[in-house]
C-alpha cells in the first residue's frame, strides 16, 4: 500500500493527519480487522475498548495509533487497509489514491439486496474455486498414487537387483570356498601321496634290508656248513691216524733195524780184512743189488707219494671248488628264489595298487557324477527360483497395473461425480430468486438465533464454512458408490437440499451482519461528516 520503506517516515507522514484521524475514526469498527491482521492482540484491544481511563473516543483512537506505531511497517499497512475498507474518503485524503476495495460503500450504494447478491456471488466463486481445487487435489492424489505405484515398482526392481547382487556375492563366496576346499583337498591328496610314496620307499628299503640280512644269514649258514665239513674231515683224519701201539711196534721195528744195521756195520768193519773172500763179494754184490732195488723202490715210493700228494691236493682243490660251486649254486638258487619272491610281492603290490587305483578312479568318477548331478540339480533349482521370481514380479507388476487402473477409474468416477454436482449446483443457481425469497421467512427465526453465535467465528475464519462444505461434499462423494445403500438420485437430491439450506442460512447470517454493520456505518459516517464539517 505504501511506497515508503522506513517506518519512521511512514508514521511521520500520518502525523500531519493525526487530528483528522482521531476525529473521524471509530476504534470499535477497525479493531476486528486489525486483530485479524495480527497487529493487535486481545490485550491491546481490551485496553483500547474497555479501559475506564479512555472514555473519550478520540483518546481511544490516539492510544490505538500509538499501539500501531509500535508495530512498525506492518501496523502502518494494516491501518491503511482498514481505512481503505471502512473510511474510503479518509483513505483518499491521506494517501491521495483511490481505494481498490469499496466494501463500506456497498450498503450505501446497493442496499442489503445488493450486498446479499455480492455475497452470494463471492460464495459461488469460492465454491467453484473449492471445487476446482478439489478436482486438482483428486488429480494430484491420483498422480501421487501413480507415482507411489511407480515407486513401488522401482523398489521391487531395486530389491530384485539387490537380491540378485546378494545371490551373486553368495555364489562367488561359495565358489571361492569350493576352490579353497578343492585346493586344500588337492594339497592333502598330494601330501598323502607323498607320504604313501615315502612309506613305499621305506617299505622297499626295509624289504631290501630284510633280503640282504636273509642273504647274509644264508651265506653264514653256508660258511658254517663248510666249516662243519672241514671239522668232520679233520675228525676223520684224526680217527684214521695210527694208534699208539702201532707207533710203538713201528718204533721197535725201527730199533731192530737200526741194531741190525749196526751189527752189519760192525760185521762189515770186521770183515774188511776178508773182503777178498768170494763169500764176501757175493754178499756185497747182493747188498748192492738190494740197495739198488731199495733205492728204486724208495724212488718209486717217493714218486708215488708225490703223485698221491698231488692227487690229494688236486682232489682237495676240486673238492673245495665243488663245494664253492655248490655254495654259489645254492646262493644263486636262494637269490633267484628271493628275487622271485620279491618280484611276486612287487607284482602283488602292483595288482593291489592297480585295484586301489581303479577303486579310487571309480569313486572319483562317482563323486564327479554326483557333483555334476548336484550342480545340475542346483542349476535347475536356481532356474526354477528365478522363473518363479520373474513370475512373481510379473504378477506384482500386473497387480500394480491393475491397482493403477483401478485408481484411475476411481479418479474418473470421482471427477464425473464432481462434474455432476457442479452441474446440479449451476442448475440450482440458475433457478429464480423468488423461491429463495419465499423460503427465507421460514428459517428466519432459526437463522437469527444462529447468527449471533456465528458472527465472531465467521470473522475469525471466513473460509471455515467452505471447508466444512468441502468436507461434506467429499464425504458424500466418497460415500457414493456400489456399496452405498441409497440410490444415486436420492443421494443427489439430499445433497442439493443440504447445500441449498446451507446457502440460505449463510445468506441470512451475512445479511443480518451486514445490516448491523450498515447501521453502525451510517451512524459513524454521519458523525464523521459532522466532525468534518466542524473541523473544516
From Swiss-Prot:
Maintained in an autoinhibited state via homodimerization in which the CARD domain forms an extensive interaction with the adjacent linker and coiled-coil regions. Activation downstream of C-type lectin receptors, by phosphorylation by PRKCD and/or ubiquitination by TRIM62, triggers disruption of the CARD domain-coiled coil interface, CARD9 homooligomerization and BCL10 recruitment, followed by activation of NF-kappa-B and MAP kinase p38 pathways. Zinc-binding inhibits activation by stabilizing the CARD ground-state conformation and restricting its capacity to form BCL10-nucleating filaments. Disruption phenotype: Mice were born at the normal Mendelian ratio without obvious anatomical defects but display impaired innate immunity. In response to C.albicans infection, mice develop fungal infections, many of which target the central nervous system (CNS). All mice die within 5 days after infection by C.albicans whereas more than half of the control mice survive for more than 12 days. Impaired zymosan-induced cytokine production. No defects in adaptive immunity. Mice show impaired recruitment of neutrophils in CNS after infection by C.albicans, an immune cell critical for antifungal host defense. There is a cross-link at residue 125 (Glycyl lysine isopeptide (Lys-Gly) (interchain with G-Cter in ubiquitin)). The keyword DNA repair does not apply. Residues 487-502 have a biased composition (Basic and acidic residues). It is found in: Cytoplasm. GO terms for molecular function: CARD domain binding; metal ion binding; protein homodimerization activity; signaling adaptor activity. The modification Phosphoserine is found at residues 2, 277, 424-425, 431, 451, 461, 483, 498. Specifically expressed in myeloid cells. Not expressed in non-lymphoid organs. Residues 99-116 are annotated as: Linker. Residues 425-451, 476-536 are annotated as: Disordered. One of its GO terms (cellular component) is CBM complex. Residues 6-98 form the CARD domain. Keywords: Adaptive immunity, Coiled coil, Cytoplasm, Immunity, Innate immunity, Isopeptide bond, Metal-binding, Phosphoprotein, Ubl conjugation, Zinc. Changing residue 303 to A: Does not affect phosphorylation by PKC/PRKCD. Disulfide bonds: none annotated. Residues 117-272, 303-415 form a coiled coil. The keyword Cytoplasm applies. The linker region, also named autoinhibitory interface, is required to prevent constitutive activation and maintain CARD9 in an autoinhibitory state. Disruption of this region triggers polymerization and activation, leading to formation of BCL10-nucleating filaments. This is Caspase recruitment domain-containing protein 9. It comes from Mus musculus (Mouse). The gene is Card9.
